[in-house]
């Protein structure tokens, strides 16, 4: 196996492009990339969505093959791209042999730019000879992430178009929140999984959408804990959210009849909402550009009078601009059944 990897690396090195340019990624790394980037290996699911939205013809494959219920919401030419595995995150199963077999012009990761990911990018780039850039996946950085990727992939106009759309959505929400004091904003709990007891602490990448939409994440210990945690039922009852968002139909099906969950304001007032998940989750799963659709949805949930949006129109427009699909009426209705608490079977 070691000999095979060495052979593949040696085979890869001579075909690096003669004409190259440099780009500074979100980690401050100066990376030499080809003048024309035609193929990209996505290091994980967030990166695959980002690349697909920006320049779908460059994506060499999905880290996980699309499921049947997701396919209608991706443009037809890209539904059958091969499964490539992933280089980063939980369950990373792609290996360097696979990357070298694909021979992409560029590797992209979208998410954290902490030292762990910088070290991985440097190591993979050194071992394969393939340039590897890191793009900051924090929600607030989304416009800049789009600009960086648009420039890297040779489609700066597309990057600017999407960045402007994101900034407009952020500005629309900010205008609403200017008139809503922090203490009057909805208390929101993200209920992950079939039991609803996995959640994301305030400030985590999994719950940025709550805070950006103007909700107060009740999973807040003052910043002592970040990321996903397992909550107890007692903690949820004490936090007493007035709004619960979830993407698991198993949880949604039973929460209103569960005597423990009935102790929360959210269940008592019927403010438990099920997020659509096709082709990607609206809340996270993964935390990428798909969250922009969830942000629009959640702003409408939390501030329906001020937002004054039409979810059907907003969804159709988003899927056209970002996922490059024209939804039929049937596809739109099937998608929004989730948001109405009726996940399609």
Which sequence ranges carry the predicted segments?
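Sec-dependent N-terminal signal peptides
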Residues: 3-14
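Sec/Tat signal peptide C-region and signal peptidase I cleavage site
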Residues: 15-20
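Extracytoplasmic substrate-binding proteins
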Residues: 21-23, 30, 119-198, 219-220, ...
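Short helix-initiation/N-cap motifs at beta->coil->alpha
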Residues: 26-28, 84-97, 223-233
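Structural recognition of the beta-strand scaffold that forms the well-ordered cores
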Residues: 41-43, 60-63, 106-110, 132-135, ...
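A short, structured surface patch at a secondary-structure boundary
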Residues: 46-101, 106-115, 218
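His/Asp/Glu-enriched short active-site or ligand-binding loop at hydrolase and phosphoryl-transfer sites
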Residues: 206-226, 269-276
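Ligand-binding pocket segment of bilobal, Venus flytrap-like solute-binding proteins
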Residues: 219-220, 226-251
